[in-house]
Amino acid sequence: MGMVTATIIMHNGINTGAVFGHVFDFSAMPATAKALFALLMCVILTTAFAMIAGFFMARFKMHPFISTMANMLIIFGLVTYATKGVSFGAIDAAIPNMFIPQIGSFPTIILWAVVAIVVVWFIWNKTTFGKNLYAVGGNPEAAAVSGISVFKVTLGAFILAGILYGFGSWLECNRMVGSGSAAYGQGWDMDAIAACVVGGVSFTGGIGKISGVVTGVLIFTSLTYSLTILGIDTNLQFIFEGIIILAAVTLDCLKYVQKK
């Protein structure tokens, strides 16, 4: 959803706008204005949908897997319907160089990832919201008794996630110069969950560090590149990922049982 939005706004000419109607033609706007407006719209849309999933979890005690899966299906349906299932066009070629400039062979998009890591680390470790996040994740009943609003903290967690989704989709749109389809990014949710689990984030809640998540991402990225270099079939790579996830979750469950 975020990437489609960014492409609509930052597209070069009206090739993408033709799918949605000329009302979405932003070609007259300056490149910088288009890029910033696209970022704003990406964040607004992704945050809105994340809030919906968070609301159902916080208000009706719905399992997060169900609320987010339903959200994902709704978004996929909307994007597929809006784009008619066709790939959307390229964005203004000048825009990516503004925010992801080429410096030799160095992938400068990593710098944005570092900024996101620092911001999330600060929120988790240096703010009241971050401390409440761990408290609610570890034991929501005890957190509520101590005066913490479980509803607000849960919704806040989804809002933070939505903002990051929007910013990430905007960056990915820049990296891919707007080229993509409604199915773009499918499967990334499993990669993200796998990286978190391998990095020590507990499914039982209340446990996890940003350094662990970064480690998990590096492990899975290294695994993917290694298997590709070794010539392992792409379909077989999913088997290796599944085994790693199963092992990591099993260890997490064993730790939880031992604590009990």
What are these regions (language model features)?
Residues I9-M10, M29, L45-A90, I123-T128, ...:
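Short loop segments and helix-boundary regions at transmembrane helix junctions
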Residues V19-L36, F60, P64-T127, V153, ...:
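Transmembrane helix-bundle core of multi-pass membrane transporters
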Residues K34-C42, F49-A53, S105-G180:
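Helix-loop-helix "hairpin" substructures at the membrane interface of multi-pass membrane proteins
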Residues P64, F106-A113, T154, G187-D189, ...:
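Loop-to-transmembrane alpha-helix initiation sites
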